[in-house]
């Protein structure tokens, strides 16, 4: 699972997801990509599940690039705990994505294989996405 080696602070505010992605919204490495259409938090487990599904489908032929990294800690309080006594402890890591952000890129495979692999990865994501091809 992906997570930062070290961070400056253990806990973060939740923040809000407004606007569209101004960075990481163009294909840079591969020929095909999976692009988000909604704002969301994507957990490191979901990122890994999508990556595994794609690499299993492509086998040795192509190359896959993961363009997002989970750098935001999400805290969870223990079950049946009374209110107060501080914020919960960090439980898992998420990547904050806005509409337009590229999640995965792929190259070195025919379009039909890429489309199939990326659609399987898209089904693992908690949001609407689209398949795009670089010109």
UniProtKB/Swiss-Prot annotation:
One function term, GO molecular function aspect: rRNA binding
Localisation: Plastid, Chloroplast
Keywords, sorted A to Z: Chloroplast, Plastid, Ribonucleoprotein, Ribosomal protein
Covalent S-S links between cysteines: none
InterPro entries in UniProt: Ribosomal_uL16 (IPR047873), Ribosomal_uL16_bact-type (IPR000114), Ribosomal_uL16_CS (IPR020798), Ribosomal_uL16_dom (IPR016180), Ribosomal_uL16_sf (IPR036920)
Keyword Flavoprotein applies: no
Annotated Gene Ontology cellular component terms: chloroplast; mitochondrial large ribosomal subunit
GO biological process: mitochondrial translation
Cross-referenced Pfam families: Ribosomal_L16
Transmembrane segments annotated in the record for this chain: none
Cited SUPFAM superfamilies: Ribosomal protein L16p/L10e (SSF54686)
Major location category of this protein: plastid
PANTHER family: 50S/60S RIBOSOMAL PROTEIN L16 (PTHR12220), LARGE RIBOSOMAL SUBUNIT PROTEIN UL16M (PTHR12220:SF13)
NCBIfam families assigned: rplP_bact (TIGR01164)
Family statement: Belongs to the universal ribosomal protein uL16 family.
Protein name per its UniProtKB record: Large ribosomal subunit protein uL16c
Organism whose genome encodes this protein: Lepidium virginicum
Gene: rpl16
